């Protein structure tokens, strides 16, 4: 079920996008477009700085005792590169390291796509998705594991507060809202 949910979220986000991908003829066209955008972010993009901060563990998925043991302060950071396409969508490659729920290092690297709607001067709301690999001690002893998740954001100038949801596959696993920030000097100059 977990893998089906991740694949469904990824496909929905791609098909709902306001990019040329929405009218692509095949999955191969979509994949080729995303590879080209990733390559563009890597070589032509601007640097991003990420700061991680908070992980909310859903009360319905964890006992009170378990939640008291878990780390909510997911402190860490990372770097990335982003490029904006002709439609105003942002394509990003990133890597982050932060303390996981068990106070151990978690490594994450991936691709993110975001689209934005203006709300006021310099204020935008965004929705998108991320496809990434993560490695942590309690899941495969740091063996890289793939995941796809939705992202929501509020961007003001060059600063962006972002949130993603990590779905659960069992009791005491997943069901986390993860908050982090991104600063990109490209915006709000």
Language-model features and meaning:
Residues 47, 73-77, 91, 105-111, ...:
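Hydrophobic, lipid-facing positions within transmembrane beta-strands of outer-membrane proteins
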Residues 55-57, 174-189:
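Outer-membrane beta-barrel "beta-signal"
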Residues 51, 77-81, 95, 109-115, ...:
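Residues on the lipid-exposed face of transmembrane beta-strands in outer-membrane beta-barrel proteins
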Residues 69-71, 87, 97-108, 135-145, ...:
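Solvent-exposed loop/turn segments connecting transmembrane beta-strands
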Residues 36-46, 84-90, 116-126, 187-189:
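Short loop/turn motifs that connect adjacent beta-strands in outer-membrane beta-barrel proteins
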Residues 45-51, 91-93, 123-129, 161-163, ...:
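Transmembrane beta-strands of outer-membrane beta-barrel proteins
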Residues 1-39, 189:
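Cleavable N-terminal export/targeting peptides
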Residues 23-81:
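Short glycine/proline- and aromatic-enriched beta-strand/turn motifs that initiate or cap beta-hairpins
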């Amino acid at each position: 079920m977990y893998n089906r949910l991740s694949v469904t979220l990824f496909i929905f986000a791609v098909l709902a996008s306001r990019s040329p991908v929405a009218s692509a003829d095949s999955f191969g066209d979509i994949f080729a477009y995303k590879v080209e955008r990733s390559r563009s972010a890597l070589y032509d993009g601007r640097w991003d700085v990420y700061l991680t901060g908070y992980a909310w563990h859903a009360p319905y998925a964890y006992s009170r005792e378990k939640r008291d043991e878990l780390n909510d302060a997911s402190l860490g950071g990372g770097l990335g590169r982003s490029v904006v396409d002709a439609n105003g969508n942002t394509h990003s490659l990133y890597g982050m390291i932060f303390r996981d729920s068990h106070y151990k290092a978690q490594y994450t690297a991936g691709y993110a796509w975001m689209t934005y709607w203006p709300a006021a001067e310099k204020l935008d709301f965004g929705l998108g998705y991320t496809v990434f690999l993560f490695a942590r001690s309690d899941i495969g002893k740091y063996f890289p594991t793939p995941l796809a998740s939705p992202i929501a954001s509020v961007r003001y100038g060059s600063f962006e507060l972002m949130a993603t949801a990590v779905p659960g596959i069992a009791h005491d696993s997943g069901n986390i809202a993860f908050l982090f920030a991104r600063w990109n000097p490209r915006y709000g100059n």
